[in-house]
Amino acid sequence: MAELRNEVATVKSAPLVPREDFPLLERTVHDRRLVYLDSSASAQRPRSVLDAMDDYYEHSHANVHRGVYAIAEEADALYENARRKVGRFIGAPNPAAEVIFCKNATEGINVVANSWASRHLSAGDVVLVTEMEHHANLVPWLMLAEQIGIELRWLDIDDDFRLDLSDLDRMLDGVKLVACTLMSNVLGTIPPFRRIADAAHAAGAVVIADGAQAVPHIAVDVERLGCDFLAFSAHKMLGPTGIGVLWGREDLLESMPPFLGGGGMIRDVRKDGFTPSELPGKFEAGTPPIAEAVGLGAAVDYLEAIGMDRVIEHDRRLVSYTQEVAAATFGEDLRIFGPYGTEDRGGVISMELKGVHPHDLAQVLDQYGVCVRAGHHCAKPLMRRLGVPAAARASFYVYNDESDIDALVAALKEAATLFG
């Protein structure tokens, strides 16, 4: 084991981008260097994103969509340019109509549940979900089950932490909607989404993809994926909080009623009714998150300058390093939940250290400047499948490197000694 540890330790490289791009990473915690390993919960923001938002507020702040004075037109151009950037980033055929700005991925999924599913599904209809879904892609469907009597059918995971697709065609029999993640926020597993989508469409089902974890880390193209809807959040991809994206096929979005009512989403209002605006406006009621859209556009610019293939390659190198160093250091005392190796896997390491509760572990790591998340990670059905109440999770991004993992492992050793 020691030989493996020494061999692994020599395979190191720098972060994919300069840490100096991220102001928060310059600070210390408990008189130690900050080691941020919680990007699956929320990523840090580069200076370019912060500057873009500041520049908007300092020079172009006004409400969008109706102002005819100069700065209002500037704000409008910035907002719609961000929409175009996002559309290009995910391969949307018609971003001007199909890219809807919302609060976050959770709200995007709820738009589909309330505006599409509630109109197209009825009692007894089946929605297929997976055991590895985040609550954001489970609870809206469970709510519909209570409200209108739909039924949920579950795709389980196998012992290798991948979806069991051995009986996929039978599982899809009679299914009207498939709700599936593009990457598990607990396991890091990347399911064979196109295979699932093709089988779902052959069975006559509509497919929604939860891209909250995947869009920040892998190249996502909605047409190559074969999804009908895609939801994701800005704050996990170097952008600000408070804004997310719902992409949908234009024909499906056209068939859906508005999710929220108010200003901005109407073409006409009468005493006896209203006429909604055209896409995407009918789903963007009220004053939208303008500065946040500008920040998201800047985050897209930053990621595109890196290249998404390089991002996932970097993540996987760190996963491989972590797996090997952890095995060499802790053996069976550290259990990692997720596929071994890097095939079909993203930069998430959820773990259980023998004899240490995940919350205690996270608190000890914090004393060494290491930021990880502990809990059920909004995935309680998956936790029950894994047989644990909670797990500690480290997650990687473009600003991490092997030195961060060395700091994590050193802090884990301290925790093992403390509770041993």
Please state what every model-predicted region is.
Residues M1-G420:
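Pyridoxal 5′-phosphate
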